Amino acid sequence: MKQILARRVVAEALGTAFLLAAVVGSGIMAERLAGANIALALLANTIATGAALLALILTFGPVSGAHFNPIVSLSSLLEKAINWKEFALYCCAQVIGAIAGVMLANTMFSLPVISLSRHSRGGVEQLLSEFVASFGLVMVIAGCVRYRWNAVAIAVAAYISAAYWFTPSTSFANPAVTIARSLSDTFTGIAPNNVFGFVVAQFLGGVAATVLFQWLIPKIKHE
């Protein structure tokens, strides 16, 4: 049992690390190649992120569920799919993996391993967009898990890709991602003083979606 849990935790750390390497690395590459064309840079970053998400969920889903995100793990806890110990270990693994992924991306592009971001993302509209993005992410997962489990990977990748464009914050929707991206002063970074507000909005959005879907689409109980 301990070995199985250890594998799940390592899968969460490894998957989150590769996700952040893809997000931050593609952001750096996109900004360098696109020059001053921010729309083109964001499009490239979106495609890379969506593709990485799809691949990583398909890879690690059978091992750990491929949460890569504390709000997804909290939703699973509220749904009684995991327990408190598993939740705590998942969250620790996700944050550690996310930071490692950012450090890797910075290093691969010959940047300081850690550089605090100066990219300000303050304002009520940014917090609202993170609430909406996080609510939508958990909404998509909750709906697919109940009736279309095999569609989770493509649905999540598609949703996050879309949310990059319909939210002014470009849809962080992940506390581990938010914390880690504050350590890269690049295209996808976030100033450290904006992190707390983002994380609170993300958790509120995730919990709200979980509670709503427990009523809207109750899980089928197998006799």
Tell where the protein language model's regions lie, with residue ranges.
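Membrane-interface helix-loop junctions and terminal tails of multi-pass membrane proteins
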Residues: M1-E223
